[in-house]
Amino acid sequence: MIRLKIRDIAESKKINMSKLSRMADVNYNTIRGIWDNPNRDVAVTTLEKIAKALGVNISDLYEIVPDEQDM
C-alpha cells in the first residue's frame, strides 16, 4: 500500500493545511482530505504542485507500507 507523507513533511516545515493550500494552489478541501487520509488516491498533477510547494521531489511524498494481510 502507498501512504502519502505530505502531512509529515509539511508539519516538519511548520506548514499547516491552509498555508500549503495557498502555496501549492490546491483546493483546501483536497489538502484536508490528504491530511486526514494519507492512503487516498491523488492526481499526479496535484502531487507535483504539492511537492514543488514543499521543496521536495514527488517521490519524497510517499512511502510503501506493507498491507496488513502481508504481515
Task: Report the location of each language-model feature.
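DNA major-groove recognition helix of helix-turn-helix
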Residues: 10, 24, 35, 46, ...
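Hydrophobic micro-packing sites on short alpha-helices
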Residues: 46-51, 61-62
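Short, charged recognition helix plus adjacent turn
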Residues: 8, 33, 62-71
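Helix-turn-helix DNA-binding elements, focusing on the entry/boundary residues of the two helices
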Residues: 17, 44-47
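The alpha-helix within a helix-turn-helix
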Residues: 10, 21, 51
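A short, Lys/Arg-rich alpha-helix, primarily the initiator
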Residues: 1-16
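Short alpha-helical DNA-recognition segment
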Residues: 15-33
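Residue cluster at the C-terminal edge of the helix-turn-helix DNA-binding motif
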Residues: 23, 41, 52-53
